[in-house]
């Protein structure tokens, strides 16, 4: 959108020179922009000091300005002497960059931009502290971690380079319970083990078993817990089923000397086997 207003020249204005606006007593005044400043606009005609002129400010993307020195394509530009355009290395006063070469005194076309190839040095960032500046200068993840994390043992852990000393220090850092530390270091005493059991197991019967000295009540409860509360009884054996058998009654060795007595002793043995359930 164009902005139009009447202004008074407080110095002789030359066409294609950079302008700066200021507030007069009753009117806006214009003059050549000061050196090393960012201008407000560019003059399109000559205006004598004290004359009134109509200023029409268009939202242009490019201006044509008289070069105050030799300019190369891509040069960052600021205001030179008498409102000319000159190259600069100071990003704080850049208002555009050249899109063509020009010698001193010639018109140069420039793009209005304060972001063209402006580089900011980390050390120039006033609000950044020393640690922040160091972090901004790092270009590797490991380097950034080394700045963010001060603890050497934690750094070793994150970098995957822990020594036994690092591991012990990390255990001390992460765990306050001495029994847990002893467990992690594989250096548990009987006292540590008992304390860890108390820490990890709430069931009194399991604790009794782990202690190696379960009470009779502990044993009964544990058997019930694992499904062994009722003794298992074998089924009776049959001719087709394997099962439990009783021990047969004692049978003396036969002393028979004839068939009749031998048969009698054999029948007695068969009876004992039947009674024991060994045979039908």
Curated annotation (Swiss-Prot):
What does the entry give for GO biological process? symbiont entry into host cell; virion attachment to host cell
Q: Where in the cell is it found?
A: Virion
Protein's UniProt keywords contain Transferase? no
Q: Which UniProt keywords apply?
A: Host-virus interaction, Late protein, Viral attachment to host cell, Virion, Virus entry into host cell
Record has Cell inner membrane as a keyword: no
Q: Name one GO cellular component term.
A: virion component
Q: What is its main location?
A: virion
Q: Which domain of life is it from?
A: Viruses
Subunit composition? Homotrimer. Forms a super helix coiled coil in the homotrimer.
Q: What does this protein do?
A: Protein that forms the 55 capsid fibers. These fibers are not always present and may have been lost in some lab strains. They may enhance the attachment of the virions onto the host cell wall.
Task: State the family named in the UniProt similarity comment for this chain.
Answer: Belongs to the phi29likevirus major capsid fiber protein family.
Q: What is this protein called?
A: Capsid fiber protein
């Amino acid at each position: 959108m164009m902005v139009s207003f009447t202004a008074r020249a407080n110095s002789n204005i030359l066409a294609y020179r950079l302008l700066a606006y200021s507030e007069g007593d009753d009117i806006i005044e214009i003059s050549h922009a000061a050196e090393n400043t960012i201008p407000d606009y560019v003059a399109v005609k000559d205006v004598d000091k004290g004359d009134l002129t109509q200023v029409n400010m268009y939202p242009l993307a490019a201006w044509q300005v008289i070069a105050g020195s030799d300019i190369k394509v891509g040069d960052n530009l600021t205001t030179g002497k008498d409102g000319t355009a000159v190259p600069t290395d100071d990003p704080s006063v850049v208002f555009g960059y050249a899109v063509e070469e020009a010698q001193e005194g010639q018109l140069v076309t420039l793009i209005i931009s304060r972001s063209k190839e402006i580089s900011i040095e980390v050390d120039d960032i006033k609000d950044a502290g020393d640690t922040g500046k160091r972090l901004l200068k790092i270009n590797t993840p490991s380097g950034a971690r080394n700045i963010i994390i001060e603890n050497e043992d934690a750094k070793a852990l994150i970098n995957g380079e822990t020594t036994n000393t690092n591991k012990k220090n990390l255990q001390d850092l992460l765990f306050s319970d001495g029994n847990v530390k002893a467990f992690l270091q594989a250096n548990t005493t009987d006292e540590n083990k008992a304390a860890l059991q108390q820490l990890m197991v709430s069931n009194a019967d399991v604790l009794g078993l782990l202690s190696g000295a379960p009470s009779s009540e502990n044993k009964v409860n544990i058997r019930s817990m694992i499904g062994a509360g009722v003794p298992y009884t074998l089924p009776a054996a049959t001719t087709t089923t394997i099962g439990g058998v009783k021990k047969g009654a004692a049978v003396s060795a036969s002393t028979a000397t004839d068939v009749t007595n031998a048969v009698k002793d054999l029948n007695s043995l068969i009876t004992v086997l039947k009674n024991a359930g060994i045979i039908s």
